[in-house]
Amino acid sequence: MFAPDKLTVGIFLPLRNYAGDMKVLAGQADLVSQIDRQGFAAVWVRDVPLFDPSFGDAGQVFDPFTYLAYLAARTKHVALATGSAVISLRHPIDLAKAATTIDQLSGGRLVMGVASGDRPIEFPAYGLEHGDRAERFAHALSYMRQLMQAGLLAIDSPLGRFKGAEFLPKPVAGAIPMMVTGSSGQSLAWIAEHADGWLTYPNATHTPTGPQHLAEKIRAWRDLIPGGAFRPHMTNEWIDLVDDPDHPRTPLHGGYVLRTGRKGLMALLEAWQAAGVNHAALGIQFSQRPASEVLEELAADVLPHFPSHGAVPPCRPWNF
């Protein structure tokens, strides 16, 4: 999914925007199987515990971990990614148990984007203070990492403590990649030290200045990574891919959605790759064309220029 100086392409779910009718999600798992066969690098799911009409976005509706477990059984190669799990809302043991279970069932394909949360309604619903989310995020990430270590553990955290017990199952490859989303209330230096990768919004996508500003942000982060080690950067965009391949990149809904033809999209992906982006997660739920048609065009005309790296999962998935 990630390699230095290379960009891969993934797909954000849902493939059709939920607006009160669950029927729009019918057949989505079949299309995810198609995404897997077509060679996309990843499928991404959101973590939206409550639908807040003021946000107007319910994500893929389903619980992210339950749904990824279902999709693990419908796919063989594609990475299964959260974008992003709000780890400040839930206990680290429960999060880690769900994550490592999916990682084992999928043969090591889980990539975990993590976030502190940005919807104020969720925190009092969980009995938590919205203002504490940054601190809880940092504690939760540390706790989860400790849980995945080998052997009997001794953990003493503001979020809980125990001694002399082992956490199971362990991740397939010894750890699950934890990609910090945005700032999550942390400094850039903290993200450089503690994150396995960084997922950020892309800035403007219809002009050259957006990728230029993104490149500056990525360079500033990478300059702070201890030892200069490679860590991937990811970004995303919601697109309305039109039939005309020459249609110019045009922002819609205040820049939330990009209407574009294939050539404009490829130019954007090339600019992102030059900026240091290693993975682009595209959301197609606002496209006017059928999802299957958009996926076919992306697979036929875009993926050959941004191929997935084809790494075999570290182990065979469990036999369901």
Residue ranges of predicted features:
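Active-site-adjacent structural elements that line small-molecule/cofactor binding pockets in enzymes
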Residues: 1-320
